[in-house]
Curated annotation (Swiss-Prot):
InterPro entries: ADH-like_C, ADH-like_N, ADH_Zn_CS, GroES-like_sf, NAD(P)-bd_dom_sf. An alcohol binds at T49, H69. Keywords: Cytoplasm, Metal-binding, NAD, Oxidoreductase, Zinc. PROSITE patterns: ADH_ZINC. GO terms for molecular function: alcohol dehydrogenase (NAD+) activity; S-(hydroxymethyl)glutathione dehydrogenase [NAD(P)+] activity; zinc ion binding. It is an enzyme of class 1 (oxidoreductase). The gene is ADH2. It is found in: Cytoplasm. Its EC number is 1.1.1.1. It comes from Hordeum vulgare. Zn(2+) 2 binds at C99, C102, C105, C113. NAD(+) binds at T49, G202, L203, G204, A205, V206, G207, D226, K231, T272, F316, R366. It catalyses: a primary alcohol + NAD(+) = an aldehyde + NADH + H(+); a secondary alcohol + NAD(+) = a ketone + NADH + H(+). The keyword Electron transport does not apply. This is Alcohol dehydrogenase 2.
Length: 373
């Protein structure tokens, strides 16, 4: 392309400070260096993680910054040493990476790349410690190595998944974060078999993606657990057969589920990050063979392990970004995985702050933001 090797001036939504509306600015995006790729972002979606770091909740503030990490685009140019991608390739940027050389990448069981594992505080490129974005010569920091709230962005090649060019980027862009996280927690970690019972705790986008995985696996009974009764109707689109609101019961929700399933579910996936929900998810699985997935710290009686329950943690659904995500896209292309039902809003890039407002009000699942007006 004519822009290869040159600085590109483009629009980007810049977060200048915590909690303030993003500002549409003209930024300069430098060409990719060794083992880097410059992508033209066509579609990006807003994830709760973007909002969390925009608000700087409990984190080290890194501003000014270009947020965004769930997106789809086309390779504009590549840096020295990049051999797997060429300009024109359709790609998904990913907030974590796969160098294909470290012990984790060589393992069939792990996706925690030593080189490119998620780093929320790093606002620069990993190779030279510099930002590729500037305004009037001053650096604008990156976010999760992706910064997809920009028309063009430079990303390490290990954080870019090449996908089927026939796949619609306005749909599969969702797979670069939340949907794959939930889907893989079910398909790759808890691995329910056809006819099993599955409980999903937390029915946001990640939880519903986990539920979609249970549906795809042929689970005979899928129990959705959430404190918001309005989530029930929406969950039915994802295969939910039963809905339990812990506030409707006087006993712990795990006891309710054990009673309604004659001893417990076969699999449980916890998608809230709440310690109490983790305990409930673990203790509602059947003794002897139950498997529960969790996201963080929790406490339970050691006897629950002696009773042959299994607890598993996972990151990004256990998918390796470069070698695993193309297969998830293929699931969508084969009509096994349904993505349209996750998309509740669509907006032009100029209205990106409206997407933040929608999420802050708890409206919808995913808002897809298109770069073209």
């Amino acid at each position: 392309m004519a822009t290869a090797g040159k600085v590109i001036k483009c629009k980007a939504a810049v977060a200048w400070e915590a909690g303030k509306p993003l500002s549409m600015e003209e930024v300069e995006d430098a060409p990719p260096q060794a083992m880097e790729v410059r992508d033209k972002i066509l579609y990006t979606a807003l994830c709760h993680t973007d909002v969390y770091f925009w608000e700087a909740n409990g984190q080290t503030p890194v501003f000014p910054r270009i947020l965004g990490h769930e997106a789809g685009g086309i390779v504009e140019s590549v840096g020295e040493g990049v051999t797997e991608l060429v300009p024109g390739d359709h790609v998904l940027p990913v907030f974590t990476g796969e160098c294909k050389e470290c012990a984790h990448c060589m393992s069939e069981e792990s996706n925690l790349c030593d080189l490119l594992r998620i780093n929320v505080d790093r606002g620069v490129m990993i190779d030279d410690g510099q930002s590729r974005f500037t305004i009037d010569g001053k650096p604008i920091f990156h976010f999760l190595g992706t910064s997809t709230f920009s028309e063009y962005t430079v990303i390490h090649v290990g954080c870019v998944a090449k996908i089927d060019p026939e796949a619609p980027l306005d749909k599969v862009c969702l797979l670069s974060c939340g949907i794959s996280t939930g889907l893989g927690a079910t398909l790759n970690v808890t691995k329910p078999k056809k006819g099993m019972t599955v409980a999903i705790f937390g029915l946001g986008a990640v939880g519903l993606a986990a539920m979609e995985g249970a549906r795809m696996s042929g689970a005979s009974r899928i129990i959705g657990v959430d404190l918001n009764p309005a989530k029930h109707e929406q969950a039915k689109k994802f295969g939910c057969t039963d809905f339990v609101n812990p506030k409707d019961h006087t006993k712990p929700v795990q006891e309710v589920i054990v009673e309604m399933t004659d001893g417990g579910v076969n699999r449980a996936v916890e998608c809230t990050g709440n310690a109490d929900a983790m305990i409930s998810a673990f203790e509602c699985v059947h003794d002897g063979w139950g498997v529960a997935h969790k996201e963080a710290v929790f406490k339970t009686h050691p006897m629950n392990f002696l009773n042959e329950r299994t607890l598993r943690g996972t990151f990004f659904g256990n998918y390796k970004p470069r070698t695993g995500l193309p297969g998830v896209v293929d699931m969508y292309m084969r009509k096994e995985l349904e993505l349209d039902k996750f998309i509740t809003h669509s907006l032009p890039f100029s209205q990106i702050n409206t997407a933040f407002d929608l999420m802050l009000r708890g409206e919808g699942l995913r808002c897809v933001i298109r770069s073209e007006e």
